[in-house]
């Protein structure tokens, strides 16, 4: 944040009062408004500049006085209006008793906001407490609010410098140089205003502003707390169960509570209804996880002067509601007089009826508001004003007196939903503006913060072929006494258009009508007169309309808001659990079907697994078909009539697609997602798998055999063996497309699905053009020849054509080829929270089975087994990457695209950081051996000869009898201690010599260590029978690095003789150890039995034979 440097003032004027404070000290209220007259601003600016220059010439010292951000208060002498302050916070309580001389008046500057927060402290802080944060030429300001709940601004010391004063030229006089300096300051001020505005919005959790209207004197931008509003999906059963489980159910039925909330009237106009006030403002101070804060409903509007008595009642905000913040930024470029601004948030419903809206059927489209809420914005209830050019007289103003209440956005009761004329909705909003009440807006940015809470019972944004539910934020006002007509600047940003929210009324209407009705109803004939052809091009701009008689200019802008329904969280609900079906069909076929999830996002691929196991030998499966059914139903506004989306095709015999739809013998739309069959001909699907090597067109038979039961000379008949199969693939759920007027005529009507084939690049190469020799003319003209024969024969692999895996029980490979298709019409979202527009889906798996007739075994009877389960399609923004928490591997990654594990990360100084200890290591006893358990990160072993622990030993039984320590069958391997390198000979074969012999000893050490770390098998010495492992540095006079020399060079391998090998074999067991019992007399004489370890280990790595152990047992007897 920028620092502020203040001008030098007189020596005795470090705490001087400005003219504003002098007037206030006499009890005269002062109301500096950003809408003050321009003439008075210029006079005050000129007089202030002259006074500053005179004070500088009279020898003012470089005494820095704090710069103060204008604050406004409620109550007191200002009568609740905006109040500007140019004094230090320390003098707030002393300004009535202290009167400085006129020449000691300082030239205050504007403080820049670093972080703005809410505070309940009412004690003002002395300015002397900030002296430790001041530097030469830079000043930090920390001003406390004057009232409880007020906001204040604070400047941090690590901010950039923004100088509005000429400290470096304190002896300068007023001259023509001030004009050039003012231009520079104006440019810097404009850049600073943009940065300050963005930080102001960011501090309140808002995104960057988006321009919706711009011309030469006005720009309107919208900033929201998110690109979309995400409403949670909460089942009534789960909600009631969780409430009872947590003890939060007070006996009130949910339906009764919803009816009570919907029964509150919402009035439109200047007195909006259902204003809500947040009672708990502390962040994170929620009552419990289901009750975050409280809203208070009242019937008062946003007018600060409203004297109506509040009639409030508390409404709980639970986890099902979503808070949303909206900021309207009105940037005025020239002094302009505007009326009050009408801001409306509404949800529009449009439903097209094919045969007309019943019962009258005089019109074909329903158009009404499902919810609506209005605000009145003017120069008295803004939250922040940033002037175009910041000066001592034009300072930033934060309106603390504005207390815009948080309001609950919910559905309008059914009886209050009235039909609207879509051609007059904009005019109706403009006509509600009071032209007699105007305000003069000075150049600058006006920020209006609008908090909203969305109820969970409102519908999400819906896009269907004959219905739309969209959310709009609309702003309307009028510019008074504007000369000339201001058209929208061609270089200015265009209004925001959302591709999924049907932003244009004309495109929406054409999409509604032309998508489904071109084959069901004749289009209206357009007159051929010249006026009819050009009348649509004679309208004015959709954002600005001019009234020539009254001198008023209409300003209108709108911003789309997308509301998305999210799937229920897996942590608190079981609604999104995986689907698993396990059944047996007529004691003939057992099938298992598993589907990963129940809530599926569009444009995603979900794995599915199907397992078929025949129970009888004569069952035959010809085809497996997976599809999704979609049913769309519309209900009239009064819940009296309804019709399905497929009725225009299903109930019109003259429709060219009528027979195609009737052949399906079902009323819903069905989209084929996957099909596996044995013949080329079949139903079109998004993915088609054709099996090539099945026997007798049976998907369960792949290994036939010859029938030898016929003893006659007839040819042998081949019989097929039915066996279980497992099919694994991924189902893709394509998203719908926003159809315009042209594309709506190309695709078939709803209910008839057409597909477009996707070419297979693997087949394209095989069936490519023949290789011709390059011609002489082509060579002379510089054309390159065709690819060589080797390059064209290079195989092409496309993974999307190999996603299906079919496994047979016999292990024989199943040969298939794949076909992929793309539907011309995708799938639509589920709509289960709006009673007038209803859309639901089901996943269906169809098995076509053939089985011999029980009465006539020679005849086959064919069956179609249908398994269906409901699924829910949600927005593509609700995919697993956005809804689920990141995995541990993702969280430990150093960067987004970096695949470096945590163990390879570096600290601040660039040193390699070791991985954190595992759970087993953290809870292990400090005195116990340091053991790296299985599944934990490997730890470099310690080779202290005094540690007699299992760290240097092997728990594997195989390697415990593989030979003594240091023994190797390979003469080329050095006779070193195996415990210090690896015991992988028995498990992974002998160790390569390259791990020991290397031109660089460092590489050899690294390889040896890697081998030692990766080997988890160690000797077991728990019974104290094995000898102490001899370290390498004792037996070979080398460093502890596994017997490798520290000097640069190769390692010399001594020739291992037979005697040395035999001597080293004794190190495996303790000296004198034998499996036979030693007699007392032999012990006294020092004679060791012949059946010692030497005889047992005479065969190297082989264990002792039975004939060697039997004599030992006989000797004992």
Curated annotation (Swiss-Prot):
Belongs to the CSR2 family. There is a cross-link at residues 191, 577, 651, 712, 794, 807, 1024 (Glycyl lysine isopeptide (Lys-Gly) (interchain with G-Cter in ubiquitin)). Residues 11-34, 1027-1059 have a biased composition (Polar residues). May be involved in cell wall organization and biogenesis. GO terms for cellular component: cytoplasm; cytosol. GO terms for molecular function: protein-macromolecule adaptor activity; ubiquitin protein ligase binding. Residues 1-48, 63-155, 275-312, 486-523, 1016-1065, 1079-1117 are annotated as: Disordered. GO terms for biological process: cell wall organization; cellular response to amino acid stimulus; cellular response to starvation; cellular response to stress; ubiquitin-dependent endocytosis. Keywords: Cell wall biogenesis/degradation, Cytoplasm, Isopeptide bond, Phosphoprotein, Ubl conjugation. Transmembrane segments: none annotated. This is Protein ECM21. Present with 799 molecules/cell in log phase SD medium. Residues 70-81, 117-130, 501-519, 1089-1098 have a biased composition (Low complexity). The keyword Methyltransferase does not apply. The modification Phosphoserine is found at residues 18, 115, 140, 286, 527, 550, 775, 1035. It is found in: Cytoplasm.
């Amino acid at each position: 944040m920028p620092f502020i440097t203040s001008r030098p003032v007189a020596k005795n004027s470090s705490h001087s009062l400005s003219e504003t404070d002098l007037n206030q000290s006499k009890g005269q209220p002062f109301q500096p408004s950003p809408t003050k007259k321009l003439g008075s601003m210029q006079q005050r600016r000129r007089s202030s500049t002259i006074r500053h220059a005179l004070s500088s010439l009279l020898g003012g010292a470089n005494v820095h006085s704090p710069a103060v951000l204008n604050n406004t208060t409620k109550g007191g002498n200002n009568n609740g209006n905006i109040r500007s302050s140019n004094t230090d916070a320390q003098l707030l309580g002393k300004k009535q008793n202290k009167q400085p001389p006129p020449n000691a008046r300082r030239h205050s500057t504007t403080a820049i906001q670093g972080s703005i927060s809410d505070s309940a402290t009412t004690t003002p802080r002395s300015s002397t407490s900030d002296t430790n944060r001041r530097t030469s030429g830079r000043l930090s300001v920390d001003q406390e609010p004057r009232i409880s709940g007020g906001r204040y601004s604070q400047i941090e010391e690590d901010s950039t410098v923004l100088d509005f004063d000429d400290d470096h030229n304190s002896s300068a006089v007023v001259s023509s140089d001030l004009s050039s300096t003012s231009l520079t300051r104006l440019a810097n001020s404009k850049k600073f205003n943009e940065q300050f505005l963005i930080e102001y919005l960011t501090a309140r959790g808002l995104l960057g502003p988006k321009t919706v209207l711009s011309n030469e004197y006005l720009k309107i931008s919208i900033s929201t707390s998110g690109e979309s509003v995400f409403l949670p999906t909460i089942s009534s059963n789960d909600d009631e169960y969780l409430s009872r489980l947590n003890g939060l159910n007070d006996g009130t039925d949910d339906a009764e509570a919803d009816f009570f909330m919907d029964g509150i009237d919402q009035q439109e106009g200047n007195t909006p209804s259902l204003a809500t006030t947040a009672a708990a403002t502390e962040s994170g101070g929620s009552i419990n996880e289901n009750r975050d804060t409280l809203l208070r409903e009242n019937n008062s509007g946003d007018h600060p002067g409203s004297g109506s008595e509040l009639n409030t009642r508390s409404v709980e905000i639970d986890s099902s509601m979503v808070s949303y913040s909206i900021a309207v930024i009105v940037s005025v470029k020239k002094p302009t007089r505007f009326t009050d601004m009408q801001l409306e948030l509404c949800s529009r419903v449009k439903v097209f009826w094919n045969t007309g809206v019943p019962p009258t059927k005089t019109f074909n489209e329903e158009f009404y508001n499902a919810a609506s809420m209005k605000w009145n914005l003017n120069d008295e209830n803004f939250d922040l004003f940033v002037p175009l050019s910041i000066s001592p007289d034009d300072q930033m103003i934060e309106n603390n007196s504005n207390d815009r209440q948080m309001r609950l956005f919910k559905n309008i009761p059914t009886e209050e939903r009235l039909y609207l004329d879509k051609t007059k909705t904009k005019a109706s909003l403009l006509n509600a503006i009071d032209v007699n009440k105007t305000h003069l807006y000075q150049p600058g940015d006006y920020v209006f913060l609008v908090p909203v809470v969305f109820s969970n019972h409102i519908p999400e944004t819906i896009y269907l072929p004959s219905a739309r539910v969209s959310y709009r934020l609309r702003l309307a006002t009028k510019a008074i006494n504007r000369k000339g007509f201001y058209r929208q600047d061609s270089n200015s940003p265009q209004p925001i258009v959302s591709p999924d929210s049907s932003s244009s009324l004309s495109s929406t209407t054409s999409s509604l009508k032309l998508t489904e009705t071109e084959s069901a109803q004749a289009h209206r004939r357009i007159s051929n007169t010249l006026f009819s052809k050009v009348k649509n091009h004679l309208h004015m701009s959709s954002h600005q309309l001019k009234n020539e008689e009254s001198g008023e200019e209409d300003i209108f802008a709108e911003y789309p808001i997308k509301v998305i329904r999210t799937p229920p969280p897996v942590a608190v609900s079981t609604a999104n659990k995986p689907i698993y079906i396990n059944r047996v069909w007529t004691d003939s076929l057992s099938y298992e079907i598993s589907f990963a999830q129940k809530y599926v996002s569009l444009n995603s691929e979900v794995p599915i697994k199907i397992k078929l196991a025949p129970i009888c030998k004569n069952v035959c499966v010809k085809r497996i078909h997976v599809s999704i059914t979609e049913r769309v139903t519309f209900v009239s506004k009064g819940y009296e009539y309804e019709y399905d989306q497929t009725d225009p095709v299903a109930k019109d015999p003259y429709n060219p697609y009528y027979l195609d739809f009737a052949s399906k013998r079902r009323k819903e739309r069905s989209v084929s997602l996957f099909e596996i069959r044995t013949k080329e001909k079949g139903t079109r699907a998004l993915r088609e798998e054709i099996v090539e090597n099945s026997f007798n067109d049976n998907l369960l038979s792949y290994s036939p055999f010859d029938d030898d039961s016929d003893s006659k000379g007839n040819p042998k008949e081949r019989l097929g063996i039915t066996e279980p199969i497992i099919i694994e693939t991924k189902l893709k759920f394509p998203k719908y497309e926003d159809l315009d007027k042209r594309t709506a005529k190309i695709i078939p009507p709803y209910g008839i699905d057409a597909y477009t084939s996707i070419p297979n690049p693997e087949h394209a190469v095989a069936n490519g053009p023949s290789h011709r020799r390059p011609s002489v003319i082509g060579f002379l003209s510089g054309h390159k020849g065709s690819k060589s024969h080797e390059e064209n024969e290079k195989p092409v692999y496309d993974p999307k054509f190999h996603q299906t895996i079919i496994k047979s029980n016999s292990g024989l490979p199943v040969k298939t080829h794949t076909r992929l298709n793309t539907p011309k019409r995708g799938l639509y979202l589920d709509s289960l929270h709006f009673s007038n527009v209803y859309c639901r889906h089901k996943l269906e798996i169809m098995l076509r089975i053939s089985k011999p007739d029980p009465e006539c075994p020679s005849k086959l009877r064919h069956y179609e087994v249908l398994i269906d389960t409901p699924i829910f399609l949600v927005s593509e923004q609700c995919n697993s990457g956005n809804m689920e928490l990141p995995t541990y591997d993702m969280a430990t990654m150093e960067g987004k695209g970096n695949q470096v594990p945590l163990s390879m990360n570096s600290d601040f100084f660039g040193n390699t950081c070791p991985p954190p200890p595992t759970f087993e290591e953290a809870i292990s006893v400090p005195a116990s051996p340091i053991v790296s358990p299985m599944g934990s990160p490997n730890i470099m072993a310690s080779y202290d000869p005094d540690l007699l622990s299992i760290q240097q030993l092997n728990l594997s039984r195989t390697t415990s009898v593989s030979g003594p320590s240091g023994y190797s069958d390979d003469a080329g391997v050095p006779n070193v201690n195996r415990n210090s390198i690896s015991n992988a000979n028995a498990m992974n074969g002998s160790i390569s010599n390259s791990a020991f012999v290397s031109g660089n000893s460092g590489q050899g050490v690294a390889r040896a260590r890697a081998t030692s770390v990766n080997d988890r098998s160690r000797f077991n010495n728990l019974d104290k029978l094995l000898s102490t492992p001899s370290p390498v540095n004792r037996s070979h006079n080398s460093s502890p690095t596994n017997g490798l020399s520290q000097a640069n060079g190769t390692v010399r391998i001594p020739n291992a003789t037979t005697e040395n090998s035999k001597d080293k074999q004794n190190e495996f067991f303790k000296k004198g150890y034998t499996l036979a019992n030693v007699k007392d007399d032999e012990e006294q004489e020092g004679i060791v039995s012949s059946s010692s370890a030497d005889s047992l280990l005479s065969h190297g790595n082989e264990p002792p034979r039975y004939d060697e152990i039997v004599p030992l047992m006989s000797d004992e007897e």
